[in-house]
Regions:
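Sec-dependent bacterial lipoprotein signal peptides
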Residues: 1-12
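Short, hydrophobic/aromatic-rich segments at coil-to-beta transitions
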Residues: 22-24, 51-56, 118-124
């Protein structure tokens, strides 16, 4: 009995501090800022999943395992970096060519997004080139 009580007292609930960012996000729209172009992504299966310090970006129509990133978040920015292609059976593969990430709305190996909106079920991220709109699932 004493062991059970001491074990329970030593447990702490871990929180990420990510707030509304944590969760499963569907990329529903990509705007190209320089041209004013818009791409409706709502019919595509591109998702970003965020938990603690890992972001997993997956295009289920192309490659179902996804890409893993570390990230840093402030109130106004999301910095993603150090991408790896998920390959658990043989070891994750470090991404060196950013073109491998374009279909996910990511244009660089190390990229910082301005958080234009992050509340409830809506997130909008922007760079100098793109604006990404997400819906939380």
């Amino acid at each position: 009995m004493a062991f059970a009580i001491s074990a329970m007292m030593s447990c702490e609930i871990e929180t990420s501090g990510n707030g509304d960012l944590d969760g499963f996000w569907h990329l529903v729209r990509v705007d190209t800022l320089s041209t004013g172009g818009m791409c409706d992504m709502s019919g595509r299966r591109v998702f970003w999943s965020v938990q603690v310090g890992i972001l997993n970006a997956t295009d289920y129509d192309r490659y179902h395992k996804g890409y893993l990133f570390h990230f840093d978040k402030t109130d106004s920015s999301l910095h993603i970096f150090d991408p790896y292609k998920d390959n658990r059976t043989e070891g994750d593969i470090k991404i060196e060519d950013p073109s491998e990430l374009y279909h996910l709305g990511i244009n660089a190996i190390d990229e910082t997004f301005t958080i234009e909106q992050l509340e409830g079920s809506r997130m909008i991220l922007a760079t100098d080139v793109l604006r990404l709109s997400f819906k939380k699932m």
